[in-house]
């Protein structure tokens, strides 16, 4: 096997990931302080793969399903936002392989079925979305990526293939009680930020154009469902830790510096919480950025179709709108 410096290569791989780390907004610490703390957790885990000359195995709970709210997304199926994110993840693995021949692989642990009833998206829609994600991987030649979902968990599917029952088994075997979840979330600011972010997602996703009820009632419902989503999400994380005990645990959300999880961006965004399935890809000055559909429409974005299917937007930077566009472009380049 080709010789390489274990410490140097391990540090280089970690640096590759740190370039895209999601931070908590308004963190009181410097980036250098945070990265030193993250390194204390992640470097030994990366080094364990390098010492054995094995591919770096990462897991990423992500790509559940599209938001049901047309104010945020283009439709129910993956579009340019997902495509660009998958291409980024695959290219990340390819870059690692340039200086570490065993390379890296990322297992996308699609979690839509884990909480479909709580996010008000039916299981058939989620299955269709996941099938399209796998098609995108195949069509784009993303050989470093693979997909794992609730239906692939043999320790659960040996009993049933019904998703309602699979969710019950997941909670029974891997979840803490909602009371324990609430107590943990209240322990620190990061827990509260997560709770508020999930609540906001659920509220926005339920604020459909045809909704005529009270916004206060919708907010209350979102707060109640938020704890359940976090409970299921953490249960899924516990299951994944059992299935892939050595894997580097990536996340779509900002994480504390002491966490085993490392939050990463998959494409530029103005929001440290926004994801491809909660937004659309908008091309601004030749660079794609994640935004909500309504935000793009307010900037007179032009909808682009590929093979007759809505794909993404292009925002032309006309002089009279430069004042609106510039803060977005600056945020993109800063990210």
Curated annotation (Swiss-Prot):
Keywords: Lyase
Domain of life: Bacteria
One Pfam entry name: DIT1_PvcA
Enzyme Commission code(s) on record: 4.1.99.24
Inactivation phenotype: Deletion of isnA and isnB abolishes rhabduscin biosynthesis and decreases virulence of the strain.
UniProt-listed InterPro entries: Isocyanide_synthase_DIT1, PvcA, TyIsonSynPvcA
GO molecular function: lyase activity
Keyword Lyase: yes
Reaction(s) this enzyme catalyzes, per UniProt: D-ribulose 5-phosphate + L-tyrosine = (2S)-3-(4-hydroxyphenyl)-2-isocyanopropanoate + hydroxyacetone + formaldehyde + phosphate + H2O + H(+)
EC top class, as a word: lyase
Family per record: Belongs to the isocyanide synthase family.
Its job: Involved in the biosynthesis of rhabduscin, a tyrosine derivative which is a potent inhibitor of phenoloxidase, a key component of the insect's innate immune system. Responsible for the synthesis of the isonitrile group on tyrosine using the C2 of ribulose 5-phosphate as the source of the carbon atom.
Entry protein name: L-tyrosine isonitrile synthase
Organism annotation: Xenorhabdus nematophila (strain ATCC 19061 / DSM 3370 / CCUG 14189 / LMG 1036 / NCIMB 9965 / AN6)
């Amino acid at each position: 096997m080709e010789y390489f410096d274990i410490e140097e290569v391990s540090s280089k791989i970690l640096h590759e990931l740190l370039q895209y780390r999601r931070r908590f907004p308004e963190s009181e610490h410097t980036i250098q302080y945070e990265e030193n703390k993250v390194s204390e957790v992640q470097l030994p885990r990366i080094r364990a793969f390098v010492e054995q000359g094995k591919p770096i195995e990462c897991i990423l709970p992500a790509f559940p399903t599209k938001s049901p709210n047309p104010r945020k997304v283009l439709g129910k199926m993956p579009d340019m936002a997902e495509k660009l994110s998958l291409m980024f993840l695959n290219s990340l693995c390819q870059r690692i392989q340039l200086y570490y021949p065993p390379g890296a692989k990322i297992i996308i642990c699609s979690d839509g079925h884990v909480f479909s009833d709580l996010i008000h998206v039916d299981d058939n829609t989620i299955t269709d979305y996941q099938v399209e994600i796998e098609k995108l991987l195949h069509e784009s030649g993303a050989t470093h990526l693979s997909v794992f979902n609730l239906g692939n968990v043999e320790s659960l599917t040996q009993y049933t293939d019904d998703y309602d029952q699979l969710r019950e088994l997941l909670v029974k075997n891997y979840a803490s009680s909602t009371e324990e979840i609430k107590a943990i979330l209240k322990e620190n600011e990061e827990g509260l930020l997560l709770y508020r972010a999930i609540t906001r997602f659920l509220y926005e996703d339920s604020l459909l154009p045809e909704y005529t009820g009270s916004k206060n009632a919708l907010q209350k419902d979102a707060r109640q469902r938020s704890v359940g989503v976090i409970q299921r999400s953490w249960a899924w994380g516990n299951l994944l830790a059992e299935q892939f005990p050595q894997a580097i645990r990536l996340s779509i959300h900002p994480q504390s510096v002491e966490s085993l999880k490392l939050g990463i961006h998959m494409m530029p965004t103005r929001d440290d919480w926004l994801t491809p399935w909660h937004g659309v890809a908008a091309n601004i000055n030749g660079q794609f950025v994640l935004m909500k559909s309504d935000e793009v429409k307010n900037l007179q974005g032009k909808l682009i179709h590929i093979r007759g299917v809505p794909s993404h937007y292009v925002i032309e930077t006309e002089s009279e709108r430069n004042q609106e566009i510039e803060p977005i472009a600056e945020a993109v380049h800063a990210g």
